[in-house]
Every structure is written in structure tokens, then in C-alpha cells.
Amino acid sequence: MSIYLSNKYLKIYYNIVKRSFDRTPPKTYEKHHIIPKALGGTDNSKNLAYLTPKEHFIAHLLLLKITEGSNKCKMAFAVNLSLIHI
């Protein structure tokens, strides 16, 4: 079974990440793991996107929407952690 469900949220997530590669990093940015470390992602530069704080929070909300099973719990934890920084 796939980690991600194929849906509109995945497309929005993809567009946020893709946009980050098509621009210079914003003045205020946060590093985002495209494939979250909790799901097997690495710190490799190809797995990092430079997002604004708002984009970063939205990206984590989208990951929560597109994951399933035990991975959904991991993404919920990540969303809760990101609330600390707001």
C-alpha cells in the first residue's frame, strides 16, 4: 500500500514544493523535508524545500490530509510541533 493517497491535497502539496524550487529562498524561510524524516526521508538537499513559515505550516497540514494509517499519526504530531513555532 502506498504511503500517500492520490488526491487533490497531494497536487496542492506538489505545487507548493515545486514553487519553492522555482524561486530564490524567501527572506524568512524554514527548511521542509519533502519526504518527511518520519516517513523515511533524508537530510539530502534534494529532499529539502525552503518554504515561508505559512507555506511550511500548510505543507504539514496537507501531509496530514494525504497520509494514511500509522503515518497519519506521525504527521499529526508534526503539525502539533509546528504550532509551537507560530
Each model region followed by its residue ranges:
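Charged, low-complexity intrinsically disordered segments
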Residues: 27-35, 57, 66, 74-81
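Short Cys/His-centered divalent metal-binding micro-motifs
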Residues: 48-74
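Generic preference for hydrophobic/aromatic residues in regular secondary structure cores
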Residues: 13, 49-50, 77-79
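Histidine-centered nuclease catalytic patch
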Residues: 19-51
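Short helix-coil boundary/hinge micro-motifs
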Residues: 1-22, 64
